[in-house]
Amino acid sequence: MAMIELGFGRQNFHPLKRKSSLLLKLIAVVFAVLLFCEFLIYYLAIFQCNWPEVKTTASDGEQTTREPVLKAMFLADTHLLGEFLGHWLDKLRREWQMERAFQTALWLLQPEVVFILGDIFDEGKWSTPEAWADDVERFQKMFRHPSHVQLKVVAGNHDIGFHYEMNTYKVERFEKVFSSERLFSWKGINFVMVNSVALNGDGCGICSETEAELIEVSHRLNCSREARGSSRCGPGPLLPTSAPVLLQHYPLYRRSDANCSGEDAAPAEERDIPFKENYDVLSREASQKLLWWLQPRLVLSGHTHSACEVHHGGRVPELSVPSFSWRNRNNPSFIMGSITPTDYTLSKCYLPREDVVLIIYCGVVGFLVVLTLTHFGLLASPFLSGLNLLGKRKTR
């Protein structure tokens, strides 16, 4: 009787062992693909990015000096979903992608300052105080950074509303979290951060206040370029003498994206669509005011979710920064800038493509299905089928 029970136990042991072996294989494959697609792929993509080289010597005709280089990252249009729009899985997926991309970039590239060019949130224009607090908490978790890295943010239309939706409460709510700073100087470089939503030019209270602030910034910049101690500038501290870098959400006026090119430019069928002033781009008048008041050497903007490079007046370059989120484009990216008081060089760093990640997942699912069916004898092993076919050909 004991021998019969022992034999019965051995007969059941082999199927259990085979099932355990299959389960371990499935778990190992799933773990490996999750590790690669959710973590390692970001290191693989961003590891290929390097800070661009920039000339670090400046000469005033008499002597040559070595200038400090500021490493700055520029990204735009993160569009964190709120409580109304978007499926929870969409929110989870896109926010995880941005968090991993940002944290990986911080670790590998070690920037000194990061600028986000508006539309931080998707529903800031209508979110309740409770929803706003939740959105801010998620943003601060996703874009957490060491104390030695500065994070600067400008407002976009989804953060405070389009001009007709904007009000003092929304603007102050945004500035309470992200500061109302308009002028930021570091390592001899001036950055002017503009609330471009408030440049409608219709004399609204917020618009008038914004223009007054910009005129004051213009005055300070002009004083920095004049002889030290000028009577019209007063006794206060002077800014660095370098021409500023202008940062805003709306692009300066351009007719369309017809002259834009590159793999992350707008789709070809959309490039000739005319832009609406104060909706897609700033008005022609507001753009001329900014260029006249600030005399920037470089402009960076967001809003369009696509890349474009244009030159205003043939001399002032503007770069539209593509969206940082998979929700807005399949191939998100950010800009890396090596900037000195007299020069700058920019390069683009591409994040993993969403379609590549989805193809990997679909391929692995197919592989696991084939592996499972083969294991239970429901599908002939492709390897064995190949050997049998090869054997038949040899016998002929």
Swiss-Prot record:
The chain crosses the membrane at residues 27-47, 356-376. Its main location: endoplasmic reticulum. It is found in: Endoplasmic reticulum-Golgi intermediate compartment membrane. Expressed in brain. Changing residue 305 to A: Affects transport of GPI-anchor proteins. One of its GO terms (molecular function) is GPI-mannose ethanolamine phosphate phosphodiesterase activity. Changing residue 303 to A: Affects transport of GPI-anchor proteins. InterPro entries: Calcineurin-like_PHP_ApaH, Metallo-depent_PP-like, MPP_MPPE1, PGAP5/Cdc1/Ted1. Its EC number is 3.1.-.-. Keywords: ER-Golgi transport, GPI-anchor biosynthesis, Hydrolase, Manganese, Membrane, Metal-binding, Transmembrane, Transmembrane helix, Transport. Optimum pH is 7.0-7.5. A motif (Di-lysine motif) lies at residues 392-396. Binds 2 manganese ions per subunit. It comes from the Eukaryota. Changing residue 249 to A: Affects transport of GPI-anchor proteins. The keyword Transport applies. A divalent metal cation 1 binds at residues 119, 157, 249, 303. Pfam families: Metallophos (PF00149). It is a multi-pass membrane protein. Its cofactor is Mn(2+). Changing residue 157 to A: Affects transport of GPI-anchor proteins. The di-lysine motif (KxKxx) acts as an endoplasmic reticulum retrieval signal. Metallophosphoesterase that catalyzes the removal of a side-chain ethanolamine-phosphate (EtNP) from the second mannose of the GPI-anchor protein intermediate. Participates in the glycan remodeling steps of GPI-anchor maturation to allow an efficient transport of GPI-anchor proteins from the endoplasmic reticulum to the Golgi. Interacts with GPI-anchor proteins (via the GPI portion). Interacts with TMED10. Belongs to the metallophosphoesterase superfamily. MPPE1 family. This is Metallophosphoesterase 1. The lineage of its organism: Eukaryota, Metazoa, Chordata, Craniata, Vertebrata.
